[in-house]
A protein has these predicted regions:
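Long, terminal "pre-/pro-" and other extracytoplasmic accessory regions
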Residues: 1-188
Length: 188
């Protein structure tokens, strides 16, 4: 386990590009993932973050909205994805791929997953929220990653891609990807 001081140092390092200040320790979270909980101010606004006591991973981060959003949704979509990847990398989640994103109310939610041996690892998802107007990270949840991420032995697909294309109910399937998906909370 890391100390509260080490957790605060991790927080300071992750949010250094956002000019973090006024960090306050709130207490310890005792959920499924044991955390040190903090509030702070930054260029993004008033924020809350949880750092895992085991390993020092950023588990949860959220910023209260402070301004009206008015970015072009099309332009924001692509740049928000890039901002999400960059922030995830800054927080220690490297080599992540965008698997889904959406935009509403001036905020983008971007779902990122790691890849291993050409397979998308959906159980290890990290969700990042980006403010569209300035591409500022305002949220992150890595609880699934924290609980599931490990090196896996990826088996060959049970169903060949050509067979899978014939099974799906979509008329025009342009490509297929190998994916590891969660199955009933306890299997993949």
């Amino acid at each position: 386990e890391i100390s509260q001081d080490r957790a605060q140092a991790v927080l300071q390092e992750i949010f250094k590009p956002q000019h973090i200040r006024n960090v306050a320790f709130l207490g310890e979270g005792n959920g499924d993932i044991k955390t040190f909980d903090f509030t702070f101010e930054s260029d993004a606004g008033s924020s809350f973050a949880q750092i895992a006591r085991k390993g020092g991973m950023l588990v949860d981060y959220v910023t209260a909205p402070e301004q009206t959003q008015n970015a072009s949704a099309t332009e924001a979509h692509v740049t928000c994805q890039r901002a999400a990847i960059d922030f995830a990398s800054q927080a220690g989640f490297c080599d992540m791929q965008v698997v889904w994103s959406s935009s509403e109310g001036g905020e983008c939610v971007v779902n990122l997953v790691p890849m291993q041996d050409g397979a998308i690892l959906y159980p290890d998802i990290v969700k990042v929220k980006i403010r569209e107007s300035d591409r500022m990270p305002i949220g992150l949840n890595s609880s699934h990653y924290a609980m599931n991420h490990r090196t896996r032995h990826i088996l060959p697909p049970r169903v060949p891609q050509s067979v899978a294309r014939g099974i799906v109910s979509l008329d025009n399937v342009s490509q297929g990807r190998l994916a590891l998906i969660p199955l009933r909370e306890s299997a993949e």
